[in-house]
Amino acid sequence: MRNRGFEIVSDFKDKHINLPTRKTSKSAGYDIEAAEDKIIKAGKMAVIATGLKAYMQDDEYLGIHIRSSLALKKHLNLVNSQGVIDADYYNNEDNEGHIMIGLINFGNEDVEITKGMRIAQALSLIHI
């Protein structure tokens, strides 16, 4: 039985997507990479594809957080401050459970997101 993990969504199978990894054995979060290049204009927001979906137990959810280096160095933040991926989002009919990351550029300069750039961290959590 599979407990939790990541898979690549069908539309991105041939696009060389990396599954999330933890940087070290003590890292809490799994680094999520951008699956595409995109420019986020100063003061604007953009949705970044990851090419990923996540499976988990029914009493779990995946918390999505901005990487602190992006917030500090690039002036980016998640549009909704923190993302929540519910267990039943996996393989849903609308988009196969594709995890999309909404970012807002609160800086004064455009920011370039490149494919493979680590843009967020995902943490597995249990809800009550």
List the model feature ranges, each with a label.
Residues 1-126:
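DUTPase catalytic domain/fold
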